[in-house]
Regions:
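A residue-level detector for the "anchor" residue at the start of short, highly conserved motifs
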Residues: 1-189
Length: 189
């Protein structure tokens, strides 16, 4: 199991009973062995749970709840409704519709963080900066709100100096980044 930045995982010292239940807030990647007698369950906010049948998967609760299945099989459960995911699918709990939506995805951008990479595929600068602010402990201010909607693509190392990342972004966008302490100011060129 791998835990991303700003993640909390609660689990018992020893799993007793008929289930292995953990409680997650944040993002984690799991590689779980199959055990029919004691299934593994990841419990999250809004009474959403992932039941695992021996698999590798990523769970993210930073902004809502989503599960991306790499291999094996999992089901997402909420309010008595269960949706089975196949490899290369993402399940998203939609609180407004009180349901789970499933879509096919390229899993790499969702799981690259565990190997020390950021992979962005036509992702909004707002979403990218949310990830970077968690990882680097930054506050982000946009001098022009439209910049949040600029879309970027690229592969970057998570352990690079943040200034290097911003220089890379400046080469491929109209955004400019100025860092003062732990605060990033983003403006238009």
């Amino acid at each position: 199991m791998w835990l991303n930045a700003e993640t909390e995982l609660l689990y018992p010292v020893r799993f007793n009973g008929k289930q292995r239940v953990v409680y997650l807030k944040g993002e984690a990647y799991f590689d779980v062995s199959k055990n029919k007698e004691m299934p593994f369950i990841v419990q999250m906010e809004d009474d959403v749970a992932v039941r695992v049948y021996g698999t590798e998967f990523n769970v993210n609760t930073y902004d809502g709840v989503e599960t991306v299945l790499v291999t094996g099989s999992v089901s997402m459960n909420q309010g008595g409704k269960e949706v089975l995911l196949k490899p290369n699918q993402k399940g998203i709990f939609d609180k407004s519709k009180d349901g789970i939506k499933v879509e096919d995805v390229d899993v790499l951008p969702y799981v690259a963080w565990k190997d020390g990479d950021f992979i962005f595929r036509n992702e909004s600068l707002g979403s990218i900066m949310d990830k970077l602010s968690r990882w680097y402990g930054l506050d982000v201010f946009y001098q022009n709100g439209d910049l949040r909607d600029v879309h970027l693509s690229g592969n970057l190392k998570r352990y690079k100096d943040v200034q290097e990342l911003f220089r890379s972004f400046e080469k491929i966008s109209d955004a400019r980044f100025k860092v003062k302490g732990n605060t990033v100011f983003i403006s238009k060129l």
